[in-house]
Amino acid sequence: MDPRKSIDKPPHHDPILGVSSRWSVSSKDNKEVTFGDLGSKRIRHGSAGADSEMLSMSQKEIKDEDARLIYINDPDRTNERFEFTGNSIKTAKYSVFTFLPRNLFEQFHRVAYIYFLVIAVLNQLPQLAVFGRGASIMPLAFVLLVSAIKDAYEDFRRHRSDRVENNRLALVFEDHQFREKKWKHIRVGEVIKVQSNQTLPCDMVLLATSDPTGVVYVQTTNLDGESNLKTRYAKQETLLKAADMESFNGFIKCEKPNRNIYGFQANMEIDGRRLSLGPSNIILRGCELKNTAWALGVVVYAGGETKAMLNNSGAPSKRSRLETRMNLEIILLSLFLIVLCTIAAATAAVWLRTHRDDLDTILFYRRKDYSERPGGKNYKYYGWGWEIFFTFFMAVIVYQIMIPISLYISMELVRIGQAYFMTNDDQMYDESSDSSFQCRALNINEDLGQIKYLFSDKTGTLTDNKMEFQCACIEGVDYSDREPADSEHPGYSIEVDGIILKPKMRVRVDPVLLQLTKTGKATEEAKRANEFFLSLAACNTIVPIVSNTSDPNVKLVDYQGESPDEQALVYAAAAYGFLLIERTSGHIVINVRGETQRFNVLGLHEFDSDRKRMSVILGCPDMSVKLFVKGADSSMFGVMDESYGGVIHETKIQLHAYSSDGLRTLVVGMRELNDSEFEQWHSSFEAASTALIGRAGLLRKVAGNIETNLRIVGATAIEDKLQRGVPEAIESLRIAGIKVWVLTGDKQETAISIGFSSRLLTRNMRQIVINSNSLDSCRRSLEEANASIASNDESDNVALIIDGTSLIYVLDNDLEDVLFQVACKCSAILCCRVAPFQKAGIVALVKNRTSDMTLAIGDGANDVSMIQMADVGVGISGQEGRQAVMASDFAMGQFRFLVPLLLVHGHWNYQRMGYMILYNFYRNAVFVLILFWYVLFTCYTLTTAITEWSSVLYSVIYTAIPTIIIGILDKDLGRQTLLDHPQLYGVGQRAEGYSTTLFWYTMIDTIWQSAAIFFIPMFAYWGSTIDTSSLGDLWTIAAVVVVNLHLAMDVIRWNWITHAAIWGSIVAACICVIVIDVIPTLPGYWAIFQVGKTWMFWFCLLAIVVTSLLPRFAIKFLVEYYRPSDVRIAREAEKLGTFRESQPVGVEMNLIQDPPRR
């Protein structure tokens, strides 16, 4: 038996009567009120979602040309006039016929691929052919094939998922009954029936539910990740008509499809009557029906037009800073390539001029055919000018791998490997929410190692967002006795028909206040206390859900809602005897100290960030109409009746004290409405609710007009505890050189208190507070702060605290530069009373004025713009849904995971990727320069001693795998060393792992090594009878050995995979050379066997290795000995074990690490 059903309720009715019959009162113990002229009025959700950055068409204005008509239960008529999409979804990108052209088109968006395609095409021309036509295409074809296979596999999985989704079954009203129909065949305008625990196949407007009041409960986990149940309502006018679907006539005029899952704006016309529809009347695809037997609705959006599919766009695309910097070096390499080609062409021109009379017989340019073969033809010679032209482009073809085509695919593979290890890091797994780290943007892993500015939300990011009611101020009197003894209070419960109901969560109570509520309304003080807790129980959107316990006679009331603050306040009201036990579309039921009372909900203005408050108008059991309002003090005190000035003053004093303790505060007010006020509000509310143009603005205006002259009832104080490990994490990040900005909507006192508890602020910091109400005042405060910091030279101990009002003048005027100058000199920045759009503005302010990397982290929808504005966005999968996660590049469960993410994985990723890019430049340039040196000894022609297949396989097989393995597995320092010494993170901030200087050092080393590889065999075999193919094999093997040993010299942590990759590549290169030389049709037939059996071959190989790498080894040794880097010092300390014996420079991070996952 459901205790909610045991509460006596009148049968449902919705008469349209005169204004005179406003009330009726029933039994003494179960008081109820019905409003004859209004019926059992459903809850209206007005003034919702007014955040400017979150507004879409559904919450702004809708014009007739932007509307669409849906005829209820008439899909033929609906789809005849409008070409609506079907309900079939398609997340797959390709089909069998479009895969090849579309995939190639997408891949060739990379300019490098176009470059190699042009090279391959040039090689097909007879005048420019250097390599075999097949061999020249192979590198590009290999890269394209690998990417195509990966894309095809991913798309196959999408196709399979689409088929499963589209073939699910739903009940659709057809031919006078509900029939099963595949989801993909559902059309707009059809009426569908969804049963309990089923998932909705489309977006539908509710017509009726199994609950006679029209309420339905849905879970939106699949849509936004929130597990709390939400209520949606069918219109009272459609409940009775839905019983006879055959005669149901009407249409819906709604906005066109949009992505805003929190907004919907439409009108319904039935029997000539116009009804307004809002977000509370629509259920979206992906939602799951809960605690409701069935629901009927009409399809308004289907398939790709549903809000769920429109939001299925994934994380935003960003490019890493390292890859952007890499493009500069690629341009430099391109210029270097042009220089080499120009040198080859110019020297060839000089040589041709000098030897123009010998071209008939001289080697490489012989024009005459002296063979005695029949039909012999002279060699083609195109003349001096054309030969120079062709030489240049032939050089481009020969030296093409100077631009490393394999680098792109290598970077992708390395990032996938890095993401795998980040995702499976047990120390970034949150047991409380059972959530692992998510890497949603693979292409910016290395940016995690270069963060300089961190912008963090507070609520839900630094704190748990699990609110606990702490104390209250009623009529200016503080009730904050929070002695531990109070925790032994058994908690409030009621008995209904032998069933005990009690709140699911217990709240510590103030004994004085508890005793006051027990006295009823015996005194004025007790009356105000009762009004206060009645306000908390009634002024909200919480849904009470009754759940079973192990004791069949005891049931728990669980309060589900979208706001943790509201949940805490309703639980507090229940603890003091005001137990909310039922909410429907038109009324709420509250048990007040054993007496069940029913309140008709006449109207509800939900919270929005413009008003910063919410209000509800109730028809009370005493036949009065009362307005209850709660909101932020900044918005509430301005609408209070000034005659209560003394109470307001005392309340402000208590609010300041609460905020100084780090508590979140709200102010509660109320007033009774007379008949004329109510009727005036009701007519305005009805007009605004049914408006299709500017509805949100009209509702805000209606709310603002009624929310005036309030009597202050009291204020609440809620504690939002810091997440575990936040203080240690912030201190480590600051030691790492990361400037932490905390952006919060809380009061300044609350924000400062949290700043101290989180170690963002310290007691020895000098605080610069800027609270300005004008542009001139703001400018003067900033200039004084700038001068003060510059004169005292104490930037390391200065904290800047600025409020949202001041930021309005800063962000909208020319003060951004001044604020940036001040902030750069401060070690901590705290912004309070900040609106969501200001968060993004602050990030943009810093991002546009520095080349340093920025990271933003948050957990709610109000953090989305900030997350997307920053170079790196991190979402917390917390209590406020998944909007932040869906907009982020990385997602995790707790703020403290930023420490291992940045200081460990970020450092590793940056170091590895920077080294890998430089190494790829080096290994390709070595090979190209060997080919270039050879040109100088072949009359400046573009012939090569190295076989074309070795040229192709060099960057694909011979040297590619080791660099990928090192990029994924190598670690320059251990995890604990990086955590214990956050200063080591500065390596990335200072770009020590990759820079233009390092690039030029690498190129100088490349020139030396290529010269050693080429000239040692050249001079060793000078004057001998060795053929060019044998010499080419020696150069190939020497190059592979040298570049792999070069890599081996830089490996820090060896394992069997690293050994297999490096030494295996050398062995694989030798095997490939042997296989190529045993093919009779190739020019180097048996060459390796001829040269490999001589002692000179092995001597040259040894001499090349020593000569190439000895200078590098010596310089590296001297630099590390005389000018060691921080990383080198830390590495040596690791080897010697001195870190374990000494005190860490940073803070001990063991306290903020999760235990390994089981």
From Swiss-Prot:
Topology Cytoplasmic: residue spans: 1-100, 151-329, 410-914, 969-998, 1051-1056, 1116-1158
Subcellular location: Endoplasmic reticulum membrane; Cell membrane
Renumbered residue ranges of the record's region Disordered: 1-30
An example Gene Ontology CC term for this record: membrane
Active site per the UniProt annotation: D457
EC number: 7.6.2.1
Keywords: ATP-binding, Cell membrane, Endoplasmic reticulum, Magnesium, Membrane, Metal-binding, Nucleotide-binding, Translocase, Transmembrane, Transmembrane helix
Record has Metal-binding as a keyword: yes
Chain coiled-coil ranges: none
Regions that span the bilayer: 101-122, 128-150, 330-351, 392-409, 915-934, 949-968, 999-1020, 1028-1050, 1057-1077, 1091-1115
Residues reported to bind Mg(2+): D859, D863
SUPFAM superfamilies: Calcium ATPase, transduction domain A (SSF81653), Calcium ATPase, transmembrane domain M (SSF81665), HAD-like (SSF56784), Metal cation-transporting ATPase, ATP-binding domain N (SSF81660)
EC top class named in words: translocase
Compositionally biased tracts (Basic and acidic residues): 1-15
Reaction catalysed by this enzyme: ATP + H2O + phospholipidSide 1 = ADP + phosphate + phospholipidSide 2
Its job: Involved in transport of phospholipids. Contributes to transmembrane flipping of lipids. Has activity with phosphatidylserine and with a much lower efficiency with phosphatidylethanolamine, but not with phosphatidylcholine.
Protein name: Phospholipid-transporting ATPase 1
Organism: Arabidopsis thaliana (Mouse-ear cress)
Gene: ALA1
